[in-house]
Amino acid sequence: MEKGQLIEFRHQGERRLAVVDRPDGKKDWVVIDQQGQSHKLKPQRVEYEIPGGPYTVDDLPSFLGEVDQYLDPSSLEVAWELLIEEGESITPADLALLLFSEQSPSQCYAAHALLAEDKLYFKQKGNHYEPRPSSQIEEIKHQMRVQAQKEQEQQGFIDRVNQALAGEKVTWEGSDRLRLEALEKFILFPEQNHRQALDILQTLGKPGRTDETQNLLIELGIWQRHENLFLRRSAYPNQFPAKVSDVAHAYLTNPPPDPDQERFDLTTLKTYTIDDESTSEIDDGLSVETLADGGHRLWIHVADPTRLLSPNDELDLEARKRSTSLYLPTGMISMFPPELATGPMSLLQGQRCVALSFGVTLDEVGAVRDFTIAPSWVKPTYRLTYEDVDEMLVLKIQGEPELPLLAEAAKKRAQWRKSQGAITIKMPEAIIKVNADEEVQIYLQETSVSRQLVAEMMILAGEVAGRFCQEHGIPVPFRGQPQPELPSDEELLSLPPGPVRECAVRRCMPRSEVGITPSRHASLGLDLYSQATSPIRRYTDLITHFQMKAYLRGEPLPFSGEQVQEILYSVMPSSKEATLVERQTNRYWSLEFLRRNINEVWQGVMLRWLREDDGLGLILLEELGLELPHRFDRPISPGDRLSLKVSNADPHRDEIRFRELLANEA
């Protein structure tokens, strides 16, 4: 390089024109650009040398003015058309001669500038430029159009976000959904790669943090303040596919033919359905039939959703994918479309309903003497709550003799199961409800005669279903539980009676197992058991219905043992995930309840140690039935009582901390 030479180099990716001023050391030079700024350069950084000179910095404005009049990008297309046939490469000087018929310094630099900025017609190779093939140009044009559309959509999205944040009403475009989903996934799965979400947040001037992004979606009205992130992370569908909904609506007015035309008519029996007041899927009812010998047959009527289904049809496969209905504090998400689940599938008061009925007689000690199972017609007489039944039993209403008979049978069954080794654990259970205004209620579900009555009848139906399927070689999901190793009597007696002792027993109970081989269920005290009483809300029960009903009709079974096992392999993980979502959601709302009631004093009892070395124990808030961890800084034993106040509760972070009150504070 020489002093006074005009050169081009790049500074932070930007093309700069500069005049060489002086050498700096053996290899470097100092140049002064059009903005008057000095730069230290190595010769290798020079991208183009302008002919002519010598130049001074004062020459640059007029020189650039001359160059501007030649900078017409459309002229490159003309040059490309002239050169493509020959396929020859050119230099900026060649292009200047071709376009301007001269090769003045300003014309040569203008040609260089056109080629340097061109991304379409020419490709640089060394100091020369080759015309691109026409096919490559069309592909680049397509990519440029796609990129321009993306940029336009991105800018439109940013504009709509800012409008929404300013309180204006916006209509989101289809392309916005992908960007909003990118932000949602960033919150739900922060450990994954989220380049798009981070780019969006940077463009919006928002920090790349999940909590701030969640607040953004709430401000935009995309998410609720208490959005259920556990449900969103899960694979559980929140909506039914259009095809499934269409089938459901069609079946309301035009149901398929009933495969069980010869149903047993039990509509003359008085039938009670007993549920919580909020229950909308009514899947069981109870009756008592008086026999000629003065004895009684208990009838457990179970809703018959398979009357509307065929194995592997749209409704069946959707239910299989869901595996269970989801019961959350904010409401239920049904395994079937709700118009069916709460309509023709349910046992509705005063309506003629299809059912699968289990008729059972018991011996004097409560064991099953004989049973019958049949598809049936029933007509529920009363829809009762548990509280209704408890009150009617206390009042001994003469017009309802069936209820005391059912209660007595349930009591006898419980005693018989206990004699067979059944293990009953009585722990307080918290019921958490959240209404439309996001008001949270937590109350204890009390043990009652009515709840024991219904539970025993359902267990009885499960025993009968299991025995029937075993006797006839019908492969269905059997539920078993290994025998636990319980604490010794001495160990249990050393613990205070009540929740602490029950907790010690519960801790020893192994998980139940589901398979096609019958096995003993330890805590129920039954040699075999197959759940069959909740086919509207539990898919494994639905399989049992499909299989038993086909056998009763004398038809081939819809599923072989191998197929039932394969279905269980797919259903059980989904069912476990649904249970986890329920548990996580309940915990979230319990922490939110405690956060809102931070000034309340709660009475608790220490249940057991979680990590005694760390002082971490499990406590029970007795008024609420909530079991939560608490770190103690003093000596304490299971069964010790304490008064607590919440010191910090953050449901979003799943954090809860209590402060133990001193005697004079409580």
From Swiss-Prot:
Pfam families: CSD_RNase_II, HTH_RNase_II, RNB, wH_RNase_II. The keyword Nuclease applies. GO terms for molecular function: RNA binding; RNA nuclease activity. It is an enzyme of class 3 (hydrolase). Keywords: Hydrolase, Nuclease. Its EC number is 3.1.-.-. Residues 263-553 form the RNB domain. Disruption phenotype: Essential, it cannot be deleted. The keyword Nuclease applies. InterPro entries: HTH_RNase_II, NA-bd_OB-fold, RNase_II/R, RNase_II_barrel, RNR_Ribonuclease. Belongs to the RNR ribonuclease family. This is Uncharacterized ribonuclease sll1290. It comes from Synechocystis sp. (strain ATCC 27184 / PCC 6803 / Kazusa). The lineage of its organism: Bacteria, Bacillati, Cyanobacteriota, Cyanophyceae, Synechococcales.
